Amino acid sequence: MRSIRSFANDDRHVMVKHSTIYPSPEELEAVQNMVSTVECALKHVSDWLDETNKGTKTEGETEVKKDEAGENYSKDQGGRTLCGVMRIGLVAKGLLIKDDMDLELVLMCKDKPTETLLNTVKDNLPIQIQKLTEEKYQVEQCVNEASIIIRNTKEPTLTLKVILTSPLIRDELEKKDGENVSMKDPPDLLDRQKCLNALASLRHAKWFQARANGLKSCVIVLRILRDLCNRVPTWAPLKGWPLELICEKSIGTCNRPLGAGEALRRVMECLASGILLPGGPGLHDPCERDPTDALSYMTIQQKEDITHSAQHALRLSAFGQIYKVLEMDPLPSSKPFQKYSWSVTDKEGAGSSALKRPFEDGLGDDKDPNKKMKRNLRKILDSKAIDLMNALMRLNQIRPGLQYKLLSQSGPVHAPVFTMSVDVDGTTYEASGPSKKTAKLHVAVKVLQAMGYPTGFDADIECMSSDEKSDNESKNETVSSNSSNNTGNSTTETSSTLEVRTQGPILTASGKNPVMELNEKRRGLKYELISETGGSHDKRFVMEVEVDGQKFRGAGPNKKVAKASAALAALEKLFSGPNAANNKKKKIIPQAKGVVNTAVSAAVQAVRGRGRGTLTRGAFVGATAAPGYIAPGYGTPYGYSTAAPAYGLPKRMVLLPVMKFPTYPVPHYSFF
C-alpha cells in the first residue's frame, strides 16, 4: 500500500475536479429558496384542507414537522389529511452536482393517497405559492408517478418533485394472510409501488444522514462518482442507492480518516475486487427488514462491465494518471522545478555561474532535525551574503597551485596524527591534525593568518571527513582556526575559562582527546554546565570541571567542545611544565588473587626494572583453570601451545612465566 503522503497528488486532482462539478452559490441559493417555498406552501395547503373538511379555521393546530422522517405516525394525527413533508434524495443527502440537480420531497398522507387528493393539492398549491413569493412556478401533476412536478421560470432551471405516500401502504403489505382487512381500497388509488419507493427513499435519507454524512471525504467521493456515472454509460446502472452503500462500506471500514484521493482509490479497489460479480457477497440493503440485495436489478453483463472499468481506473491511479479517470487536464507539480544561478566571483574578476535546483526542493516533508538545521543555516548564510568557503578553499583561490607535503605520521592506529607542510613565498608552514585533510586545513589557517586574512568562526565553515564526523555529537558543529601546535593563540577568560576553536577535533600535544587524557590522570571527574548563551544558530556553552581543588572552565559551540576545552585548560595548568612531575598520579598494581598471587607478584617485580610503575597494556594472567577445561599450553590437542607469536615478540611486550595446572582428563572421541 502506498504511503499516506503519496496520495497528495490524487487529493489535489480530486479536489480540483470536485470544485468544477460542485454547484455555484447562486444555484445553491436558488435550490434553497425553491424547496423552502414549496415546503411552506404545502403546510398552508394542509391547513386549507383541514379547514375545508371540518368547516372551521384551525390555524393554531400543530405545524407540520419537517425534520421528522418517521413512518410510524401516531393515530392522534388523524385530524390532518396531510401529516408532513420531508426532504429525500439529493437534497437531503447533500449530493447535488452541476447538471444533475433532481429535487425531491415526500408528502406524507394520513390515508392512502388517491388521485382525487393529488388533484386537490395540485390545484391549491399555486395559490399558496403566490402568497409566499413573487416568483413564478409551474405546477403539474403526474398521476403515473404519484407526484406533483414544480418548475421555476428563471435561471437556473430547477425541477422539484413532490411524491405522495402513506405509511399504511407498507403496513398493509406486512400483514399476514388471514388477518382482517380494515376496508377496501378506493378505486382511484395511486400507484402502490411508487408510494413504496417514496417510503424507501425516506428510509435511505435517514440512514445516509446517520451513517455517511459523518465520514470524511465520503460525500466528496460520492459527488465525483455520480459525475462519473453521468459521463460514462458503463457506470450508469450503479448510480443511486447502491453507489451510496458501496462508498459508505468502503470508507467507513477504514480505521482512520481518509483523504479524498485515498478514499476514491479505496472505493475503486472495492469494486475492482469483484464484489459485484456473481458468486460474490452482494450488497446488503440495511433499510429493509428482509435480506435484500441492493444490486438485484443489475444484469450480469452490467456488473462485469463496471468491475472491468474499476480495474482499469485503479491501474491508472496506481501509475499517477488519475486525471484520466476524472477526465481533466493533469495539474502542474505543487513544487515547480526552478533553476537558480549561484555566481562566485574571484579577486581577478572572473565570474562563473552554475544552474542548480533550489535548496528547498530536496527537503520535502522530511522531519530530520539535522536537515532542518542545515536548511536554517543556509538561509542565515544567504541572508548575510557570506561566502561559503573554508580556509583551504580560500587559500587555493588566492594562491592556486600550492603543493602540500606530508612530513610525518605518528600516534596510535585509532588516533593518528598527521603533520602537513606547505611552502608559500619561501616560508614553510606546518600544522598537525587527526587526518591529512584536517592538517591541510590547519596549515591553510596558519598561512591566511600570516597573510593578514580573517579566519574567524563566521567565515571558516567546518569541512571534515566522514571519520571525524562520527566523533562529533552534531553534524553542524562549525568551529574556527587553531591547531594542536598553535594552542598559544587560544583565549583564556576569568576563572580559567578556555575557549578553543579548531577546524577539527580538539587534541592535546600527544594527539589524544583532552577529556580522555585527563580521565587517565584523574578519574571520576564531573563536568557541569555553567551557562548557555546565543541563538539557535550560534550557541555558546560553558562547562566547568574541578581537578585537585581547582576549577577550570571551557567554552565552545556545543557541550562536547566546551568539555574538551575545560579538560585542555586543566591539562595545561596542572600537567604541563614544572607541574607535571608533582601532579603525576601513582598507579597501584592490583594484587592477584588465588594460587598464583606470589608468583605473579614476583614476576611483576622482576620485569618492572628501573622504577617502572606498572604494567603496560599486554599480559593477562588468568586464575586457575576451571575443571573440565584444558589450560593453554598444557596437554592441548593437535600440538598447539602458548609459544611466542608467529611474527615475533613486540618490543615492549611483558613476558610472564606460564603457570601449568593439573586438569581433569577430557575424553576424546573418534568417529572414524
From Swiss-Prot:
Q: Which residues carry this modification: Asymmetric dimethylarginine?
A: R612, R617
Q: What's the subunit arrangement here?
A: Interacts with EIF2AK2. Associates with microtubules; it is unsure whether such interaction is direct or indirect.
**Top-rank taxon:** Eukaryota
List the cysteine pairs that form cystine: none
- Disordered, as annotated region: 52-73, 349-371, 466-499
Protein purpose: Involved in spermatogenesis and sperm function. Plays a role in regulation of cell growth. Binds to double-stranded DNA and RNA. Binds most efficiently to poly(I:C) RNA than to poly(dI:dC) DNA. Binds also to single-stranded poly(G) RNA. Binds non-specifically to the mRNA PRM1 3'-UTR and adenovirus VA RNA.
Q: State the taxonomy lineage.
A: Eukaryota, Metazoa, Chordata, Craniata, Vertebrata
Annotated keywords: Cytoplasm, Developmental protein, Differentiation, DNA-binding, Methylation, Repeat, RNA-binding, Spermatogenesis
User: What InterPro entries does UniProt report for this protein, alphabetically?
Assistant: dsRBD_dom, DZF_dom, DZF_dom_C, DZF_dom_N, NT_sf, STRBP_DSRM_1
One example of a Gene Ontology biological process annotation? cell motility
Q: Could you tell me where the Basic and acidic residues compositional bias lies? A: 357-371, 466-476
* Domain DRBM per the UniProt entry, residue ranges: 387-453, 510-576
Q: Give the molecular function GO annotations.
A: DNA binding; double-stranded RNA binding; microtubule binding; RNA binding; single-stranded RNA binding
Q: Where is the composition biased (Low complexity)?
A: 477-497
Kindly provide the name given to this protein in its UniProt entry: Spermatid perinuclear RNA-binding protein
| Main location class | cytoplasm
Give the GO cellular component terms, alphabetically: cytoplasm; manchette; nucleus
The DZF domain is annotated at 5-363
Q: Where in the cell is it found?
A: Cytoplasm
